[in-house]
Amino acid sequence: MHDIDFIKNNPELFDEAMQNRNFGKIAHKIIELSANKKHTLTQLYSLQKERNNITQEIEKLKKDNIQCDTQIELSKEITKKINHINNMIKTDSELIDLLNILPNIPDKKVPIGKDENDNIEIRRYGKKVDFKFPPKTHYELGENLNLMDFKQAAKLSGSRFVILKSQLAQLDRALANFMLDVHTQEFGYSEISHPVLVHESAMYGVGQLPKFADDSFKTTDNFRLIPTSEVALTNLVSNANINANELPIRLTACSQCFRSEAGSAGKDVRGMMRQHQFNKVELVSIVTEEQSELELERMTQVAEEILKKLELPYRVMMLCTGDLGFSASITYDIEVWIPSQNQYREISSCSNCKAFQARRMNAKYHTISNGNKVNKFVHTLNGSALAIGRTIIAILENYQNQDGSITIPHVLRKYMNNQDIIKKQ
């Protein structure tokens, strides 16, 4: 959600920001709708005040047994006008509906561009494996080991699902425990276990609704399955007013995530790269305005640390204006090397949403300035650290051996009964 006062005071700047995000000029319409809303509400308050005065007059006249038919008729006329104006309050709805579909303003650091081709590489880490044989895909490796079953998953649930067995199921669990241990023990995040069904208001709070309604699964009674733990963790501070001394708040969770993958027809149709259901470890930070810039750098480094410990080659990209997520003001994508595709693929996305989500959730913090309490909107950040399914893909492909077995990364072996290799049983 946007600050209307900012739009009124900076219409050209706002239009430029929206154009950089592939939207047209919109500031004038927002200002006009806001003025209409203000005028309508002024009329409404004036009529309500007038009716209250007449009502008091009628009560007094009746008490004194004085005829008051004229006042009663006038009260009825005013009531009709009030009802008419209440019906016109759709102007307010139109303004909110418009603001609800406008993305966040890009940070000044964000490069201007149309799509992923205009993203900028920030840094790389790790050396790519020099295979002495043609590397297999993760799904070839998994199926050959009889540990990855797409056919049985399709019988149960259709396409874009997978069943992991034995050592791969253990690897999935090991990765979750490893990531959570790093985040909580080394970086001070608090682990949260939360529902995966949330009210639509929670989805609205982080910007998933209304614009991306088709991307999530709706159940009954206005519940939605979460596409990411970001939804649950960020909404823990909705309608809160936190003492600034309690910030930053850093939370982490591992949960199942559910995505309809609307618009992804034909993309990554084989394997685990793009699934309707997957596990992911998420990071969320709730901070002050002054803390948010450095917090994004810290969060990104935390996500990178997982890949460093797993010894997986990766690169960090800064997304351009045209590729930013809806709620993000600035985003770093971390892309891991996938040998079979001979390219880097996204495994984490770390974003600073600044006050955009906080306005939708009414999440604030307070400080004392010159003896007075000052309320401000918190800044929210979120990051994948990491998507577990894609981490499994990266491990299978980067740690594969010529015989089709998989060497288990050293940091995971204590989570897998000290096994050092995954092989066909």
Curated annotation (Swiss-Prot):
It is found in: Cytoplasm. Pathway: Aminoacyl-tRNA biosynthesis; selenocysteinyl-tRNA(Sec) biosynthesis; L-seryl-tRNA(Sec) from L-serine and tRNA(Sec): step 1/1. GO terms for cellular component: cytoplasm. It catalyses: tRNA(Ser) + L-serine + ATP = L-seryl-tRNA(Ser) + AMP + diphosphate + H(+); tRNA(Sec) + L-serine + ATP = L-seryl-tRNA(Sec) + AMP + diphosphate + H(+). CDD domains: SerRS_core. Its EC number is 6.1.1.11. Keywords: Aminoacyl-tRNA synthetase, ATP-binding, Cytoplasm, Ligase, Nucleotide-binding, Protein biosynthesis. Disulfide bonds: none annotated. It comes from the Bacteria. One of its GO terms (molecular function) is ATP binding. ATP binds at R259, S260, E261, E346, I347, S348, S349. SUPFAM superfamilies: Class II aaRS and biotin synthetases, tRNA-binding arm. One of its GO terms (biological process) is selenocysteine biosynthetic process. L-serine binds at T228, S229, E230, E282, S384. Belongs to the class-II aminoacyl-tRNA synthetase family. Type-1 seryl-tRNA synthetase subfamily. Homodimer. The tRNA molecule binds across the dimer. Consists of two distinct domains, a catalytic core and a N-terminal extension that is involved in tRNA binding. PANTHER family: SERINE--TRNA LIGASE, SERYL-TRNA SYNTHETASE. This is Serine--tRNA ligase. It comes from Ehrlichia ruminantium (strain Gardel).
